[in-house]
């Protein structure tokens, strides 16, 4: 899993070969927290 920001978004996402899953989230977002274990499953 890669943490994205302005400096690497284009290279890691827009220029990536293949499929990329980008998860936008916030520590205060309860639905985001609920999905996080499933996002980690994709990483494996």
Curated annotation (Swiss-Prot):
The keyword Cell cycle is annotated on this UniProt entry: no
Entries under InterPro entries matching the protein: Thioredoxin-like_sf, Thioredoxin_domain
Keyword Transport attributed: yes
Disulfide bonds: 29-32
Domain Thioredoxin: 2-44
Keywords of the record: Disulfide bond, Electron transport, Redox-active center, Transport
Main function: Participates in various redox reactions through the reversible oxidation of its active center dithiol to a disulfide and catalyzes dithiol-disulfide exchange reactions.
Family: Belongs to the thioredoxin family.
The name this protein goes by in its record: Thioredoxin
Organism this protein belongs to: Tissierella creatinophila
Gene name for this UniProt entry: trxA
């Amino acid at each position: 899993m890669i943490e994205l920001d302005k400096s690497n978004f284009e290279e890691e996402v827009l220029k990536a070969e293949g499929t990329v899953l980008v998860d936008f989230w916030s520590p205060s977002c309860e639905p985001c927290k609920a999905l996080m274990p499933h996002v980690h499953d994709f990483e494996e």
